[in-house]
Amino acid sequence: MAEKLKVDLVTPYKKILSEEVDEITATGALGEFSVLPGHAPFLTSLKIGELTYKKSGQIVHLALNWGYFEVEDDKVTVLVETAERADEIDLERAKAALGRAEAALKKLSPEDKDYRVMEAALERALIRMQVAGKAARK
């Protein structure tokens, strides 16, 4: 069994991360899960949420959009629409996005075709703010 996990995190635009880590935690469609070296192979979808990894005692936080997470032979591949490290998130921009999403949702009914889009925007803004707050507390 390997002592580390090799993690590659990729968006359609660039590779965000390629590192060996001790542990990784993400938000799957069925809830939060963690992976340690020696984990059984699996593939799952990710929802908008937080990804954290631990490396040499340090914990790094990222905000993720929808995607996929695969584990095989101590190699983790994360494919997502977007990913931002906590210290890269513009908190004011996230707050503005939250305000826009809340305002749009007040004007829409759940049957409206844009309602779910705005719900996702709201969720994304909340996660970005939550993750950015973790960088601010360091």
From Swiss-Prot:
Pfam families: ATP-synt_DE, ATP-synt_DE_N
Gene3D superfamilies assigned: ATP synthase delta/epsilon subunit, C-terminal domain, F0F1 ATP synthase delta/epsilon subunit, N-terminal
Cell inner membrane found in the keyword field: yes
A GO BP entry: proton motive force-driven ATP synthesis
Topological category with respect to the lipid bilayer: Peripheral membrane protein
GO molecular function: ATP binding; proton-transporting ATP synthase activity, rotational mechanism
Annotated keywords: ATP synthesis, Cell inner membrane, Cell membrane, CF(1), Hydrogen ion transport, Ion transport, Membrane, Transport
Subcellular location: Cell inner membrane
GO CC terms in record: plasma membrane; proton-transporting ATP synthase complex
Principal location listed in the UniProt entry: membrane
NCBIfam families, alphabetized: ATP_synt_epsi, PRK13446.1
Protein function: Produces ATP from ADP in the presence of a proton gradient across the membrane.
Family named by the database record: Belongs to the ATPase epsilon chain family.
Binding partners and assembly: F-type ATPases have 2 components, CF(1) - the catalytic core - and CF(0) - the membrane proton channel. CF(1) has five subunits: alpha(3), beta(3), gamma(1), delta(1), epsilon(1). CF(0) has three main subunits: a, b and c.
HAMAP family: ATP_synth_epsil_bac (MF_00530)
Protein name from the UniProt record: ATP synthase epsilon chain
